[in-house]
C-alpha cells in the first residue's frame, strides 16, 4: 500500500485540483485510489452517506475515484465561526468549538483521529492520495502539525510540492519553502509541479533547469492555466463569468462574513442564461430578478452585518418591486422573525430579530442535522436533491406552505403567501437540472435551457486527468505511487 502527498507553497496553489487529477489518472490505470485530507479548514462541506460532514474538495476527489464520500477521507474539518475560533468536526461529527490556542493543545487528539482514518484507508486501497493544507512552511504552525509535514513524517510518505506560477515568484516559493523545512522533510519532497502556466514553455525552461540544479529535485511537469473548469472552489468565491445570452436572469448573492457552502451557486455561474453577481461590503444591492441569501456559519452575526450594510432595506425594496427572494439554510433562518441561540453556539447566548419576511422562528441547537435528501420542489413538482447541514430547528405558521416535499415524508422550508419568497434548508438546490430550471422559471426566466451540472463536473475531471497524462512525468508518478 502506498501513500503519496501533495503539498503546496501557498493556499490556492492547486493542491485540490492536482489531487483530483491524480486520482482520476490513477483510476484510468486500473489502480484503486482513495483521497485523503488530514485537516481541512473550510466553510464549504459535503454530507456523506452515513450523515457525516467532510470538505467539498474531498467529495469531488471521491467522485474522481468513483467512490462515495466517506468521513475517513477528511477526518478533521474546521469550520470558522469567528475571526479567532472554529467548530471542530472529527470523523464527520461536530465535537466542540475552539479558539486557535485551545485547538493547538487539541492537535494531539486530532492527530489520533487522522492516523486512524489513514490506517483504515491504506488497508482498503492500494494508493492513498493525500492533500495538504496551506503551506508546510508556516513557522508558527509547525509545532504539532497534523496537516502537512507532521502527517507525512508520521506515516513516512513521499511529497510532491506544487506552486502557482500565475501569482509570480514561483521559484522563490519553491526554494523558500524547501529551505524552511527540516532535513528529513526536505528529503520527503520528491519533485515539483508548477501550476497555471501561460505562455511558451521554452521561455520557462532555463528556470526549470536552474531549479533542478539548485535543489537536486526533479520538476515533474508544468500544468497550463485552465480558465473554464467547472469544479467547486473550496476557499474563495469564484466570480468568473462566461459568455451569456442576450436575455438573462440577474441573480444577486450578498456575501456576508461567514458565508458557507457558496458552491451552491456554481451551477448558476455556469448557466448561459444567468448573470450571477456576488455583492460585497460597501456595494449596494442593484436591481435584480432574484436575490439569494446564502448559508452562514454565524447567522446572528451575519444578520447584524446585513443590517449594518443597509441590505435589509434593499431586500425590502426588491420585494416591493416584484423581485423574487430565496433563503438557503442560514438564509432561511434570517428570513424569519427571530433566531435564538440559548446555548451560545455562535457566540454570546441570546436572540436576534430576523428580517420578519416569513412567519417562523429558529432555535439553534447543539445537535447538527446532516443528511442527503431527495424530494419534489412544490413550485412545479420538479425533482430535487440536495443535502442538509444545519444546527437550527425552525417552527412557525409559514412552514404550512412548504417549499419541498421530501421523499422521507418530511416537508422542508416555506413559500410566502404571495409566492415571492422561497426558503429551504437544502444545499445543492441548483445542481439538479429539473429543480434549477423550475427555480429560474419561478424567478422570471422564460425558455430555460437545461444544463447537466454533474456531466460538466465529470467532463472536467476527465480533462484534468488528460493534463496529467500530457504534461507530467507519468513514469515518475507511477514510481512514487508504487505502480508498475
Curated annotation (Swiss-Prot):
Name of the gene: cobQ
Organism in which the protein naturally occurs: Pseudomonas putida (strain GB-1)
Gene Ontology MF terms: ABC-type vitamin B12 transporter activity; catalytic activity
Pathway(s) it belongs to: Cofactor biosynthesis; adenosylcobalamin biosynthesis
CDD domains for the chain: CobQ_N, GATase1_CobQ
One Pfam match: CbiA
Active site, renumbered: 329 (nucleophile), 427
GO biological process: one example: cobalamin biosynthetic process
Swiss-Prot/TrEMBL keywords: Cobalamin biosynthesis, Glutamine amidotransferase
Functional note: Catalyzes amidations at positions B, D, E, and G on adenosylcobyrinic A,C-diamide. NH(2) groups are provided by glutamine, and one molecule of ATP is hydrogenolyzed for each amidation.
Domain GATase cobBQ-type: 248-435
Gene3D superfamilies: 3.40.50.880, P-loop containing nucleotide triphosphate hydrolases (3.40.50.300)
UniProt key word Hydrolase: no
Domain of life (superkingdom): Bacteria
Stated family: Belongs to the CobB/CobQ family. CobQ subfamily.
Identification of the protein by name: Cobyric acid synthase
Amino acid at each position: 500500500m502506498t501513500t503519496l502527498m501533495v503539498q503546496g507553497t501557498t493556499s490556492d496553489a492547486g493542491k485540490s485540483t492536482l489531487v483530483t487529477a491524480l486520482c482520476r489518472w490513477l483510476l484510468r490505470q486500473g489502480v484503486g485510489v482513495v483521497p485523503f485530507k488530514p485537516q481541512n479548514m473550510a466553510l464549504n462541506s459535503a454530507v456523506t452517506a452515513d450523515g457525516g460532514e467532510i470538505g467539498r474538495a474531498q467529495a469531488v476527489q471521491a467522485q474522481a475515484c468513483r467512490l462515495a464520500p466517506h468521513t475517513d477521507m477528511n477526518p478533521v474539518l474546521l469550520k470558522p465561526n469567528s475571526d479567532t475560533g472554529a467548530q471542530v468536526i472529527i470523523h464527520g461529527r461536530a465535537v466542540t468549538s475552539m479558539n486557535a490556542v485551545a485547538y493547538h493543545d487539541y492537535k494531539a487528539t486530532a492527530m489520533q483521529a487522522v492516523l486512524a482514518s489513514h490506517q483504515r484507508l491504506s488497508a482498503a486501497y492500494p494508493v492513498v492520495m493525500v492533500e495538504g493544507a496551506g503551506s508546510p512552511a508556516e513557522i508558527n504552525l509547525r509545532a504539532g502539525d497534523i496537516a502537512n509535514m507532521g502527517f507525512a513524517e508520521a506515516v513516512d510518505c513521499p511529497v510532491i510540492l506544487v506552486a502557482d506560477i500565475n501569482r509570480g515568484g514561483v521559484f522563490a516559493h519553491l526554494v523558500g519553502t524547501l529551505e524552511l523545512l527540516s532535513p528529513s522533510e526536505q528529503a520527503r519532497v520528491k519533485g515539483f509541479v508548477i501550476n497555471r502556466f501561460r505562455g511558451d514553455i521554452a521561455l520557462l525552461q532555463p528556470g526549470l533547469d536552474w531549479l533542478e540544479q539548485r535543489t537536486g529535485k526533479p520538476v515533474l511537469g508544468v500544468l497550463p492555466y485552465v480558465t473554464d473548469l467547472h469544479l467547486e472552489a473550496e476557499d474563495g468565491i469564484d466570480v468568473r463569468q462566461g459568455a451569456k445570452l442576450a436575455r438573462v436572469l440577474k441573480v444577486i448573492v450578498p456575501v456576508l462574513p461567514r458565508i458557507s457552502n457558496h458552491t451552491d451557486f456554481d451551477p448558476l455561474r455556469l448557466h448561459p442564461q444567468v448573470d450571477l453577481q456576488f455583492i460585497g461590503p460597501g456595494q449596494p444591492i442593484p436591481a435584480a430578478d432574484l436575490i439569494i441569501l446564502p448559508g452562514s456559519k454565524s447567522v446572528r452575526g451575519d444578520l447584524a452585518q446585513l443590517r449594518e450594510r443597509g441590505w435589509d432595506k434593499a431586500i425590502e425594496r426588491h420585494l416591493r418591486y416584484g423581485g423574487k427572494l430565496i433563503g438557503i439554510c442560514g438564509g432561511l433562518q434570517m428570513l424569519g422573525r427571530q433566531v435564538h441561540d440559548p446555548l451560545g453556539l455562535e457566540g454570546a447566548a441570546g436572540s436576534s430579530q430576523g428580517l420578519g419576511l416569513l412567519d417562523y422562528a429558529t432555535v439553534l441547537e447543539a445537535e447538527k442535522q446532516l443528511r442527503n435528501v431527495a424530494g419534489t420542489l412544490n413550485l412545479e413538482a420538479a425533482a430535487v436533491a440536495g443535502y442538509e447541514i444545519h444546527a437550527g430547528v425552525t417552527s412557525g405558521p409559514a412552514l404550512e406552505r412548504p417549499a419541498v416535499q421530501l421523499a422521507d415524508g418530511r416537508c422542508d422550508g416555506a413559500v410566502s403567501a404571495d409566492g415571492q419568497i422561497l426558503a429551504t434548508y437544502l444545499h445543492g438546490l441548483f445542481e439538479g437540472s429539473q429543480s434549477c430550471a423550475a427555480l429560474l422559471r419561478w424567478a422570471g426566466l422564460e425558455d430555460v435551457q437545461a444544463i447537466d451540472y454533474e456531466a460538466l463536473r465529470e467532463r472536467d475531471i476527465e480533462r484534468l486527468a488528460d493534463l496529467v497524462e500530457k504534461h507530467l512525468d507519468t513514469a515518475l508518478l507511477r514510481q512514487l505511487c508504487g505502480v508498475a
